[in-house]
From Swiss-Prot:
CTP binds at G27, R30, R111, D154, R157, R160, R163. Its EC number is 2.7.7.72. A single active site specifically recognizes both ATP and CTP and is responsible for their addition. Keywords: ATP-binding, Magnesium, Metal-binding, Nucleotide-binding, Nucleotidyltransferase, RNA repair, RNA-binding, Transferase, tRNA processing. It is an enzyme of class 2 (transferase). ATP binds at G27, R30, R111, D154, R157, R160, R163. This is CCA-adding enzyme. Catalyzes the addition and repair of the essential 3'-terminal CCA sequence in tRNAs without using a nucleic acid template. Adds these three nucleotides in the order of C, C, and A to the tRNA nucleotide-73, using CTP and ATP as substrates and producing inorganic pyrophosphate. Has no poly(A) polymerase activity. Its cofactor is Mg(2+). The keyword Lyase does not apply. It comes from Bacillus subtilis (strain 168). It catalyses: a tRNA precursor + 2 CTP + ATP = a tRNA with a 3' CCA end + 3 diphosphate; a tRNA with a 3' CCA end + 2 CTP + ATP = a tRNA with a 3' CCACCA end + 3 diphosphate. Belongs to the tRNA nucleotidyltransferase/poly(A) polymerase family. Bacterial CCA-adding enzyme type 3 subfamily. Mg(2+) binds at D40, D42.
Length: 397
């Protein structure tokens, strides 16, 4: 049993010693079986939320009505959820009623995919009622029960299924893929924020190419913001190795570039995904820097971060691997610029006012920009004395 489970065992044992059933469930069990890095450890129990709260000193109520309590144990947090069944779903995304039950199998039956519907006992035995291990061995994404039923319960499960394809390198079972194509319009009921989270994870997976192609084949892409008329662009975009990028800003900049979205249309496209303003601004800045010649002024205006991001995207459009030497050369060229911002100039607006003996006006910022360009391009050294002499010689203003 992995360390993360051993660390969580006291929580399981406290529940069991109090006369309750308790198991590790979900993604942690899947990743353990696959020998992958394990993320959050979740626990399922037949103890009611009130009973869970009484058994542990430190708890947080994050959704008691749905059976979920966070247990704080040592320096970790564990989501402890009561076995439950869910009745009719509202808006294809949330159950109208939750009923607490005593059967682990019935609880696991409501989960989305077989690979996520396994449990583990306190002694490390995996309980697999729906063939999750077999599907992992065969690298197949399959729903628990009829896919149409699962997707009508929560339409986001369609996008989640394709996201797991990308992350795990699996394929969809034929019936799961057919059901996505049939039920795709249900995704319109899901909030943009939830779709954005899944889509970003999909892009970052090692098998994003196959996943994006599945979005195209099932036409699920039509239910994603700004994609409806982008089928051909999406086909070519699927070839891009998004997994080699390291930030959200790079991810969305690469998407803009590969989809052929022009800069004037970029804000509308990115806002449709309800991205934070900072991400939108930086992604557009990277896309704007992309494709420009690497002269001194371009590098200066771009800044180190956007410059390297644009260079990475440019390289990855030609090759799946980054050329670290070229990136270091670009970084070196940037580091050797005489100044990195207007603040680095050895002369200020106040100095210009004194030198010119003129009242303040637009001319001050214009003259600073003129000096800035001369310094960046190497025509002028960044020393106050030289700048003042140069200004007198040039007779600017």
């Amino acid at each position: 049993m992995e360390k993360v489970f051993i660390k969580a065992l006291p929580v399981l044992r406290i529940l069991i010693e109090a006369g309750h059933q308790a198991y590790f469930v979900g993604g942690a069990v899947r990743d353990s079986y696959m020998k992958r890095t394990i993320g959050d450890v979740d626990i399922a129990t037949d103890a009611a939320p009130d009973q869970v709260e009484r058994l542990f000193q430190r708890t947080v109520d994050v959704g008691k009505e749905h059976g979920t309590i966070i247990v704080l144990w040592e320096d970790e947090t564990y989501e402890v959820t009561t076995f439950r069944t869910e009745s009719d779903y509202v808006d294809f995304r949330r159950p109208s009623e939750v009923q607490f039950i005593s059967s682990l199998e019935e609880d696991l039956k409501r989960r989305d995919l077989t690979i996520n519907a396994m449990a583990m006992t306190a002694d490390g035995k995996v309980l697999d009622y729906f063939g999750g291990k077999k599907d992992i061995d065969q690298k197949v994404i399959r729903t628990v029960g009829k896919p149409e039923d699962r997707f009508q319960e929560d339409a986001l499960r369609m996008l989640r299924a394709v996201r797991f394809m990308s992350q795990l390198g699996f394929t969809l079972s034929p019936e799961t893929e057919e059901a996505i194509a049939k039920e795709k319009s249900l995704l319109s009921h899901v909030s943009v924020e939830r779709k954005t989270i899944e889509f970003e994870k999909l892009l970052q997976g090692r098998a994003s190419r196959q996943a994006l192609q599945t979005l195209i084949q099932t036409r699920l892409y039509e239910e994603l913001p700004g994609f409806y008329h982008k089928r051909e662009n999406l086909i070519s975009t699927s070839e891009f190795p998004f997994f080699s990028l390291t930030s959200r800003e790079e991810l969305w900049a690469a998407l803009l570039i590969n989809l052929g979205i022009v800069l004037k249309d970029a804000p509308l496209f990115l806002k449709a995904w309800k991205l934070p303003g900072k991400v939108i601004k930086e992604a557009i800045h990277i896309a704007d820097t992309f494709g420009q010649s690497l002269d001194a002024m371009t590098m200066y205006r771009a800044g180190k971060k956007a410059l390297l991001s644009a260079a990475k995207i440019s390289q990855l459009r030609q090759n799946e691997k980054l050329d670290e030497k070229k990136l270091k050369d670009i970084q070196y060229a940037y580091q050797n610029l005489p100044i990195k911002s207007l603040k680095d100039l050895d002369i200020t607006g106040k100095d210009l006012l004194a030198l010119r003996n003129r009242p303040a006006g637009k001319w001050v910022s214009e003259e600073l920009q003129w000096i800035e360009q001369a310094v960046v391009t190497g025509k002028l050294s960044n020393q106050k004395k030289h700048i003042e002499e140069w200004l007198k010689t040039c007779g600017q203003h």
